[in-house]
């Protein structure tokens, strides 16, 4: 089953934290979920050049806390923090609530699956050869410290008349092992011949085996203690 399901959803609540952390009554849930979608779509559309890998949202009664994980935080913050203040005002206008914005820098963007997928999509839009792009991307990701990489392209590759899939794998990719930290990213390349889907899986290693929820954050399920049997 781990071969088919989204690796992030497969691990969410067990070894991966939820990207949206809040509680709402049933009648308000739909509206708040739509707000989260609007925030993520707005950030991806306006700050594509900022290399945002993940957007986390936390809600309290008084405010909405938005945490941006970016490889280029300077693009979001701007000179003397002017850009981030403008962005905070835009988010408050979009949501109609007070917004607390926080920007965190990603230490190793080369092994972030979403950023790798977006980089491949940008190269395909610029008419780069897809096989050469796959080879270079896999080499750079493995050199950055990844334990394994899997990339799949789907569409009219190389301008071919018929769409097809091209897949390339390096290293280990234990998708069914929940202890394995598998990052997943997806992006679409809008080429002249049509859309090309880019899927990327990156094996970032194993979670701590004896952590007993040391890796889990608030809202996650801790590791259960071993059951003792009495004779």
What does each model-identified segment do?
Residues 1-231:
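RNA-contacting regions in translation and RNA-metabolism proteins
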